[in-house]
């Protein structure tokens, strides 16, 4: 048995990790109304993307990997001698990536494809990839890995803030926000992932209060966890994310592992300006 681990591009793993563990990536993409396309990779300058989004008159559209893209990756790994492929995907609640990866796996012969719905995005999705790789190295079988990731998912989550709900509403990536329409003037929405979907959690008066709310909600959840990895995931307001990262490093118990990451184009397109996330995993994740 030889097991590969792959993912889609919204896990936002560093190129060093991709190269070190030979992780195959199925890229998602973003397209603007003038035809400008950003296919996700570590070569994209995220500042250029945010500038383009700010100057665009319409919300960009996102595209999941085509089934053919998944099939090509699976066949390549099969031809390299892999018998099984663990595939970690962006939440099925906001993308069809999981469904297309699963369907492609049903169409490929000679290799067993095990698709896993992270029900999250960005580097929290990436944590499942890194955990799966660690378990492959330790000799676990595919079903044992999927079972462990499923258990890990019960102790994993994320909260988000954005400047407004415009992008999320127009892209259809938020659930249950209708009652908030027209009520967010001078208010900041606090959101969370619940069962793979982004839902409204709370409205607060200022960005400062919104960031404090992120921190309080997450730290209240993880206070009884034996192990914790926290992720500050930053958007285009660089200083806010850096300040929260430093504060958590200073404030959290030594048992906590605090890491920093950034949103890539696809998730940034859904969130719009001012996106900032704080995610948690009830494990110590190997990040190198």
UniProtKB/Swiss-Prot annotation:
UniProt-listed InterPro entries: DegV (IPR003797), DegV_C (IPR043168), DegV_domain_contain (IPR050270)
Keywords annotated in UniProt: Lipid-binding
DegV domain ranges (all copies): 3-282
Domain of life according to the entry: Bacteria
Keyword Iron on entry: no
Keyword Nuclease set for record: no
SUPFAM superfamilies, per database record: DAK1/DegV-like
PROSITE patterns (UniProt xref): DEGV
Binding locations of hexadecanoate: 62, 95
Protein name: DegV domain-containing protein SACOL0812
Organism: Staphylococcus aureus (strain COL)
Organism placement in taxonomy: Bacteria, Bacillati, Bacillota, Bacilli, Bacillales
């Amino acid at each position: 048995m030889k097991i590969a681990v792959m993912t889609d591009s919204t896990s936002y793993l560093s190129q060093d990790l991709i190269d070190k563990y030979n992780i195959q990536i199925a890229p998602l993409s973003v397209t603007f109304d003038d035809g400008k396309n950003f296919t996700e990779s570590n070569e994209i300058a995220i500042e250029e993307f945010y500038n383009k989004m700010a100057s665009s008159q319409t919300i960009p559209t996102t595209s999941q990997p085509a089934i053919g893209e998944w099939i090509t990756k699976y066949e390549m790994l099969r031809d390299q001698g892999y018998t099984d492929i663990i595939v970690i995907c962006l939440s099925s609640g906001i993308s069809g990536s999981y469904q297309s990866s699963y369907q492609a796996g049903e169409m490929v012969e000679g290799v067993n494809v095990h698709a896993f719905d992270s029900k999250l995005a960005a580097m929290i999705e990436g944590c499942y990839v890194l955990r799966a790789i660690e378990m492959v190295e330790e000799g676990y079988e595919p079903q044992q890995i999927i079972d462990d990731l499923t258990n890990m998912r019960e102790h994993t989550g994320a909260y988000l803030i954005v400047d407004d709900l415009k992008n999320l509403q127009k892209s259809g990536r938020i659930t249950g926000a209708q009652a908030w329409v027209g009520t967010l003037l001078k208010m900041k929405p606090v959101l969370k992932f619940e069962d793979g979907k982004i839902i409204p959690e709370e409205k607060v008066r200022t960005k400062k209060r919104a960031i404090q709310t992120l921190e309080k909600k997450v730290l209240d959840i993880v206070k009884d966890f034996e192990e914790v990895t926290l992720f500050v995931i930053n958007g285009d307001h660089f200083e806010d994310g850096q300040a929260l990262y430093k504060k958590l490093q200073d404030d959290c118990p030594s048992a906590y592992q605090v890491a920093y990451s950034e949103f890539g184009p696809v998730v940034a397109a859904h969130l719009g300006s001012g996106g900032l996330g704080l995610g948690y995993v009830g494990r110590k994740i190997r990040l190198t």
